[in-house]
């Protein structure tokens, strides 16, 4: 997607790395992203992922006149790396519970801060 966007921009291109970081952030703030924790259960994720791939395929085909990405290719890629995802997944809840057991002080602010944060809030109800 990055490469196609750069080509379409012509002399106005920005020099992207072409690794999909920009489109990934667009999905994130557009509240359609797949998050790391979602990768724990690919069967449960499948419906949302189908919608996301369909969304991007419409852009690829209709805006850039490019070939669509087969959904099964995306699922196969995720299945091939699922062990890696599980290896690096850790729960914030477990971390917080540990701090509580250690009697550490924890401060939360939710009304205007953390709960609205795009990374740590009540996604997708974030700003």
Where are these regions (language model features)?
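Non-transmembrane, aqueous-exposed alpha-helical and coiled segments at domain scale
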Residues: 1-127
């Amino acid at each position: 997607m990055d490469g196609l966007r750069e080509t379409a921009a012509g002399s106005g291109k920005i020099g992207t790395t072409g690794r999909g970081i920009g489109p990934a952030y667009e999905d994130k703030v557009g509240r359609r992203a797949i998050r790391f924790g979602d990768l724990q259960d690919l069967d449960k994720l499948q419906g949302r992922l189908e919608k996301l791939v369909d969304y991007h395929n419409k852009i690829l085909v209709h805006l850039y006149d490019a070939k669509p990405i087969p959904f099964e290719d995306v699922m196969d890629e995720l299945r091939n790396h699922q062990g890696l995802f599980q290896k690096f997944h850790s729960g914030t809840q477990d971390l917080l519970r540990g701090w509580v057991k250690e009697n550490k002080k924890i401060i939360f602010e939710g009304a205007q801060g953390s709960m609205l944060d795009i990374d740590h809030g009540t996604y997708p109800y974030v700003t």
